[in-house]
A protein has these predicted regions:
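A structural boundary/capping signal
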Residues: 1-123
Length: 123
């Protein structure tokens, strides 16, 4: 999943379009990533502060944590961890008003297109 996401993430799907780079493709994608992980594997969504910035990751039903976007941070020190609902995450928006729901829908479409292209026979 992470490899596929790196192929469909861009500045437009990041919560930080000005800070996003191809060298750090996970930047600003934690909200859409946690929704996709929850779609695939279930579990809970956790939120904490990393360097004063809000960050989300997943806790799977077996108790293990999955964070597809942790590497966007140089220093990893999490505080104020709490569980958040899927509805809460979907209701968030970036500064220009583009909602996580809209960014999530874009990523879902791109993943479907990517997977469809990869399944097509070579002619």
């Amino acid at each position: 999943l992470r490899g596929e996401l790196e192929r469909v993430w861009d500045a437009g799907t990041s919560t930080d379009p000005d800070g996003w780079t191809s060298e750090n493709p996970a930047r600003g994608h934690c909200t859409v990533a946690v929704l996709l992980v929850q779609d695939e594997f279930g579990g809970r969504i956790l939120r904490g502060l990393v360097g004063g910035l809000s960050h989300f990751w997943n806790r799977l039903p077996d108790g293990s944590d999955v964070d597809l976007t942790r590497d966007q941070f140089v220093v990893w020190h999490v505080t104020d961890v709490e569980e958040r609902s899927r509805e809460y995450v979907l209701g968030t928006a970036r500064e220009d008003g583009l909602t996580t729901r809209d960014r999530y829908a874009t990523i879902i479409r791109r993943l479907a297109d990517l997977r469809d292209v990869e399944r097509r026979p070579i002619r």
